[in-house]
Amino acid sequence: MKLLSVLITFLLATVIYSQTNPATLTFTVQVYDQFPGYNNNFQTNGAGARVTGLIKSTLNSTTRVPELVSTATGGLNGVGLILNPSLFPYFFSPQQDSSLPGQNSPLSLDLVFTYDTTRNIYVYNNQNFFPIDNQGLDVDPAKRIYLNGATYHNYHFCMKMNTVFTYKGYEVFNFQGDDDVWVFINNKLVIDLGGVHGPLAASVDATTLGLTIGNSYNFDLFFCERQTVGSTIKIETNLLFVCPFEDYCGVCQGDGSSCCNPLTTCNDNNQCTIDSCPPANTTIGSGSISDYCIHTPKINTNPIDICFNYQCNSSTGNFDPIPIPCLDRSSECLSTIGCNSTVGCQYESICNSNVCNIQNQCSSNGTCVPKSSNDCGIELDGQVDKCKIYSCDSNGGVGCIKEDKCKPSEDKCHVVSCDSLTGSCITTPLEDPLAGLHLCSIARCNSSTGEFTYDPIICTPSSNPCISTQCNATNGQCYETQIPGDICDCGCGIPENKCKVSWCTPEGICQPKFKSEIDDNNSCTLDSCDPCTGIISHMTAPQCLSCNQCSN
């Protein structure tokens, strides 16, 4: 069984100017209910002892709560049964978030001091000091598991008292107690009874602290009950405490946590705010404390991204990325293809998807510029060919195409060509491949096939039957020649005399004459012709029968 008995004696000087002291004084202090399941520095069940030097000798002037000298386990902390140094800050500071270690429940407690007229001191004496039974965390029956025999009490809590007194020059105080008790005057540690231990006593003579009469000094008392099973407290004081301010919970220099829980009192159901209680010195006027809560917007800790704005999700508290809309640049023929976190919005020309548009070129009215025939000419040939017709076919991504301006004639006997300087179409007859070889023939072209045939030139006959007309193969001209009379058929034959033929004179007169072959021009023959049969005979002349020396 553990006995908690704290005896702190604050000797009060007689009130100056014979002021009558009230019969009772009520001082509201801050209490932090603890539960061993949340903070294992409580109910360690170890063999404790008084340990000095656990906390720093100078009080933190900002937080005004003690700080451990070391955060290491073991050593002095182990002797003082501080098994988990990381949770020590929650001995005297609020931690109301159940999702985090070290949860406690802040409460306020009124200590009522009674004036002892015989000794001119105020006394608080409670030999069964269980001020927060069934309160704080122990509102949950499952937490009421620590007993003294069959009797339940709340054995795990810490208390702090932060106030100010004006030094008169004669103050002293004495106390007796068990478990952690630390007292600071002027932010200096003057009582050091750390650890889990039995009742111990200590005294402080304020006249030995180098204080100046008339000056005001901080007085800070810290007390913890950390283990079952007994608890007593007795306080006697003649110090004239002055409370610089009370928090809105009524606690002297309190932090507001005894009546304000940021997770419940100040919960605005918006996960995008950090809810906190009002500053401790806030004056609560009309309305409730929750009307004065502070709701600080959460700060986005995501790296800056020029493609996204981060917006807090009020349901989750997470910062969701919201894409930043890219500018509409359709008037520049540009479409968005996404955003790059380094350079921002990316665009591409809508004109580039059509092969018949000039790449990356947009008109002033926001439409793509189509390729002209000249553009296609330059693209295909390096320059415009006047003998070509250029166009662009977007179907199937074909792009620029060209065709001859001058189309072949349907008449195969004519050739269509183009003047490269003017682009004019010129039609010329198909050239005879045998031209010059058949001057006495007329070449004829088949318009369906383009093939040539050749008809001979017919020269006009002469009216003179003794004149022949014919074509000159060297120049293709018709010319006349005289037909020898003996072969000229004048049409005046003598049928009754078969030894004669027609003879045509140069004048064209028909005169019959003997056939020329009757005369063989041999003087040794006698030439004759049978007029009836036309048989020619050549008999030897008589004069040539003997000599055979006839001359021709």
Curated annotation (Swiss-Prot):
Question: What InterPro entries does the record tag this protein with?
Answer: Fibro_Slime, PA14/GLEYA, PA14_dom, Prespore-cell_inducing_factor, S_mold_repeat
Do you know which NCBIfam families this protein is assigned to? Fibro_Slime
Location relative to the cell:
Secreted
Which GO terms of the cellular component aspect does the record hold?
extracellular region
Domain spans labelled PA14: 114-255
Does the keyword section mention Phosphoprotein?
no
The protein here is known as Protein psiB
